[in-house]
Design a protein with these regions (language model features):
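Blade-edge motifs of beta-propeller repeat domains
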Residues: 1, 37-61, 93, 97-122, ...
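Beta-propeller blade termini
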Residues: 1-12, 16, 40, 62-73, ...
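Hydrophobic beta-strand segments that make up the repeating blades of beta-propeller
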Residues: 18-22, 79-83, 139-144, 189-193, ...
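Flexible loop/turn segments at secondary-structure boundaries
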Residues: 27, 87-89, 148-150, 196-199, ...
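Short, solvent-exposed loop/turn segments at conserved positions within beta-propeller repeat blades
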Residues: 28-34, 88-94, 144-147, 201-206, ...
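A compositional/structural signature marking long, glycine- and acidic/polar-rich segments
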Residues: 121-184, 188-190
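Active-site lining segments that contact anionic ligands and/or coordinate catalytic metals
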Residues: 146, 173, 186, 205-207, ...
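Secondary-structure-rich domain cores
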Residues: 301-311, 318, 322, 327
């Protein structure tokens, strides 16, 4: 399915063309339905699919977001594409790619040279180009599930991952926008998260943790979502029958619900299995605002309670009440 569309002038002819970032979990990563598409506008609102190969299609990319910026300052719009997940491998980090435009709608993948730290950055849900350090070029901010808020500073077209404190806010982030919310001339961030109205809770002291491994040795990865208790151990969110549906050998370990009811992740799998598992955490679920104080510093504020009732998948900023402030 089309996850995100973007209208931008791909071929520098003065009209808006259309890029569609496509993805989904229904198909193998080798199915062409996952391929992104670029449609050229003839100037009269008629769109024709580009015959040029898009770099993301040759690497079986499961796209989640597309953003445009003139990265190399040559007058045309270049692209960032984020990878939502790797098919059949939930939890395994995806990558972002930087595509430079030749001015005619032909794109080249320059990620390995211009932004190598985008490789395996995480399960990307959204991104934004914004001049967050106020140095007159657009930086790249990337968010996702089990990810921090990752700022890539633009240094003459090369993107360097910052050591910003925002990278420590590990969430199920879904959307991001920027605006000057306090009128100090610096761009701040508002970021949509899972919210606080569900059975899930997370903090730095008691994070949610996802373990990913082929626990039942059947050549398929098994993601197991857990929460931390006061005793320091992690316990599965899923019930016994759900886990057995995923991993049949657990039926012998836990023959009934009584034997399973107090089982921690350490009771389910060996220490070697857990040590060799991919482990990623979430420590914040609130949709939040980060006020830019300059020099890479931000003040954190939760959005009001009504903004926490559900996951925030999209954000739109506008001065609705005409008071000079962004709502």
């Amino acid at each position: 399915e089309t996850i995100e569309p973007l209208f931008f002038d791909a071929d520098s002819d003065g009209d808006l063309d259309l890029y569609t970032a496509n993805g989904g979990i229904e198909f193998s990563k080798f199915i062409p339905y996952l391929s992104d598409k670029l449609y050229f506008n003839d100037g009269n609102g008629n769109f024709t699919e580009s015959k040029l190969e898009l770099p993301t299609n040759s690497i079986f990319f499961n796209s989640s977001t597309v953003e445009a910026s003139d990265i190399d300052k040559d007058g045309d719009m270049d692209l960032f594409i984020g990878e939502r997940l790797i098919s059949d491998s939930y939890g395994v980090p995806g990558s972002g790619v930087i595509l430079l435009n030749n001015g005619k709608g032909s794109f080249k993948d320059v990620t390995s040279l211009n932004a190598p730290e985008l490789k395996n950055i995480g399960m990307i849900t959204d991104a934004i180009f914004v001049d967050i350090d106020n140095d007159n070029d657009e930086d790249l901010i990337v968010i996702g599930e089990f990810m921090g808020i990752n700022i890539f500073f633009n240094e003459k077209g090369l993107f360097k991952l910052s050591k910003s404190e925002l990278s420590n806010y590990k969430g199920w982030w879904q959307s991001i926008q920027s605006g000057d919310f306090n009128g100090d001339g610096l761009l701040d961030l508002v970021v949509g998260n899972h919210g606080l109205n569900s059975r899930f809770s997370a903090s730095k002291e008691f994070p949610i943790r996802l373990y990913v491994n082929d626990f039942d040795i059947n050549d398929q990865l098994d993601p197991v979502l857990t929460f931390k208790r006061e005793n320091g151990k992690f316990y599965p969110y899923d019930l016994r029958h759900n886990l057995i549906d995923q991993m049949k050998p657990l039926k012998k370990v836990f023959p009934d619900y009584r034997s399973f009811r107090s089982a921690s992740i350490e009771d389910m799998f060996s220490s070697d299995q857990l040590d060799n598992s991919l482990k990623i955490d979430v420590n914040i679920l609130s949709s939040s605002i980060f006020i830019n104080k300059g020099n890479g510093k931000f003040d954190f504020h939760e959005l009001p309670q009504k903004a926490q009732f559900s996951p925030v998948y999209s954000l739109f900023l506008k001065d609705f009440d005409l008071d000079g402030d962004l709502d």
